């Protein structure tokens, strides 16, 4: 058994090796020619470390995660930096109609369905194939009826760390029966470093390339409206600190307990890979840019993080991380004018999302 620690984040492969659901789990460390690293496990596709330098060359882990497989499996935050499917985000009351048939999904977020259900893609061991030093491909076949979904869905996800410090996630999925498909990744980013003694994201400078967003009701389900961000706390078209308006006296901020809303990304054409968002830590000068082919981007500011211990004893309190979940829109099956999430036999679902890291002094 390989016990060699990861050079920069100190994780040990043996701490991620066990058997779950009859399948073996493991740790895969992706490295580029700069010596930077992304560490992932095939349990739920969890990203457990992203090691990048600051303006002085000092390294820190920029994603919240755990340092052993049992803590990943039993995390107080089940969606901590994992793959999400079959349906990312919420579906109202877990109900939708497809081709004249009504489906009832598991409801695990009050009366609503969230992120594929309690045993969604985050809670399964994926088959893993190491492609190179900087790439791994994960595969999972979701059987017919899993969490109430129709059709058998086969999913491939490729993780790659490029020499330009881009963490690239490519998704593909096929089905044998008409179904819905909305995949995403729920990485909790702390570009200030997860071990920072004051881990708040309030001072992180954020930009989101969206003129519109989806308002939500008190259960976080879209109302069906598509509203302008102009003149609201949701206007990040010009960079501003995340904390500037996060506690504003605003109904939408109150409904989300902060930011937990889908942005309608500005696109010249459907499916183009384009700039979605950017954050910068003014202290370390680290930056992260998000590019995606998806029409929507859920910005979630860790409003419900439960102040638990994570990797190497780091504490993950409320609003210590921000998520940028590239996706179709929430509750799309119940809003026919939202971008379609339907997938039919013979079609291939595809998505590409890039998280690009850098330093800007």
How should these model regions be labeled?
Residues 2-361:
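An exposed, glycine/acidic-rich loop-and-rim segment of catalytic or binding clefts
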